[in-house]
Regions:
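Active-site neighborhoods and metal-handling regions in enzymes and metal-associated proteins
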Residues: 3-166
Length: 166
């Protein structure tokens, strides 16, 4: 989530890469496709975007900034164990690409300390993927709009802890 009411140009650029990567991976999350193939698609989009921004030179360098996997099963546990071969109908998985650029990275400092990750829950069906969290704003414009709205918790006051604990 954007911590202010708008993204900086650098945050916006990185967010768009992650968003594009996720959109492509969601569309590729078809029964019969492999977890590996959708990860590779996502990784390639992130690597290409980072190259276009001049953050990396070689696509293999993207791993520094996209150091995690793309997906896991959701079931009885949030990170349910399971077969990570081919996707099958009725599986529920996450698709969550991300980019993290720590301070002192070998790129322009304007990119430092930016972290973007977008996670959605996807139901695999024989007719195609269904995004179970599609009702939440996901693109940067939708998030900026949401961040400018008044919070539903604006006047909410948390009770004092010592009143709750006896």
């Amino acid at each position: 989530m954007c911590i202010r009411d708008s993204f900086s140009p650098e945050q916006k650029a990185l967010y768009q890469i992650v968003y594009d990567s996720q959109e492509a991976a969601i569309q590729a999350a078809q029964a019969g496709n492999s977890f590996r193939s959708i990860y590779q698609l996502s990784y390639d989009i992130v690597a290409d975007g980072l190259q276009q921004l001049g953050i990396i030179i070689e696509s293999s360098e993207a791993k520094k900034y996209y150091p995690h996997g793309l997906s896991h099963h959701i079931g009885l546990d949030v990170h349910d164990p399971g077969n990570y071969g081919k996707l099958e109908a009725n599986m529920v998985i996450t698709i969550e690409p991300g980019i993290y650029i720590p301070e002192n990275s070998p790129c322009d400092p304007k990119w430092w300390n930016i972290g973007i990750r977008i996670e959605d829950d996807i139901l695999i069906t024989n007719e195609g993927p269904i995004n179970l969290s599609a009702g939440v704003p996901r693109d940067w414009k939708g998030i900026e709009t949401l961040m400018k709205e008044e919070s539903a918790l604006k006047d909410f006051i948390l009770p004092e802890i010592n009143r709750l604990v006896h």
